[in-house]
């Protein structure tokens, strides 16, 4: 009886394997994936308490996009489909009033010439739990880029990420100022 159960289980597993293998597309990518990265001017987030100077004791929250990774798939005339992971590092300053903070960020698909084809906004939540530092990896399961025909390669596009900053935060970053709360470690 044990032999029959073992053979039956093996037959089921082999059957499952073949169905799972059929789901994966074995065709070669039609070309390279689009380059992906964080836009330098908006890769850092620094917020100060309202009405205060831009000094270290007045920092409420900071964040930085640490890494961006992408996997893409396309063949023949299929649209380019990408999955992305974004690593964030967060800091909570002495002027912060809450143990959680939502950081707004965007993901944009552009042509290599800079024309924005699509842009979506997201929030990533930091939960400090009484600590000063936190980190998180956010996953975006599906980014789809339609292609006119199979001659259009992923290298014709870029996928860019950054924080959705206020004009003051953007000016702070462009001035080259940096306050990262993990600098004291």
Give residue ranges: language-model regions.
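Sec-dependent signal peptide recognition
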Residues: 1-9
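C-terminal motif of bacterial Sec signal peptides marking the signal peptidase cleavage site
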Residues: 12-15
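Bacterial signal peptide processing site
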Residues: 17-20
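Post-signal peptide N-terminal segment of mature Sec-exported envelope proteins
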Residues: 24-51
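Low-complexity, acidic Ser/Thr/Pro/Gly-rich terminal tails and inter-domain linkers that flank the onset
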Residues: 54-77
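Mid-length scaffold segments of soluble, non-membrane domains
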Residues: 74-119
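Internal, hydrophobic beta-strand segments that form the core of beta-sheet-rich folds
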Residues: 103-110, 155-168
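Short, solvent-exposed, Trp/other aromatic-anchored flexible loops in extracytoplasmic proteins
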Residues: 124-157
């Amino acid at each position: 009886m044990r032999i029959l159960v073992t053979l039956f289980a093996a037959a089921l597993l082999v059957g499952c394997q073949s169905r799972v293998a059929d789901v994966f597309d074995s065709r070669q990518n039609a070309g390279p994936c689009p380059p992906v990265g964080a836009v330098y001017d908006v890769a850092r987030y620094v917020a100060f308490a309202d009405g205060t100077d831009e000094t270290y004791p007045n920092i409420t929250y900071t964040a930085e996009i640490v890494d961006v990774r992408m996997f893409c798939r396309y063949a023949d005339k299929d649209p380019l489909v990408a999955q992305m992971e974004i690593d964030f590092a967060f800091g909570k300053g002495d002027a912060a009033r809450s143990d959680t903070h939502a950081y707004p960020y965007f993901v944009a698909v552009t042509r290599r010439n800079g024309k924005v084809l699509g842009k979506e906004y997201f929030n990533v939540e930091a939960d400090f739990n009484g600590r000063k530092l936190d980190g998180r990896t956010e996953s975006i399961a599906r980014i789809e880029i339609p292609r006119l025909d199979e001659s259009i390669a992923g290298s014709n596009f870029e996928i860019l990420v950054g924080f959705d900053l206020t004009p003051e935060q953007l000016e702070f970053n462009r001035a080259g100022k940096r306050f990262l709360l993990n600098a004291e470690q």
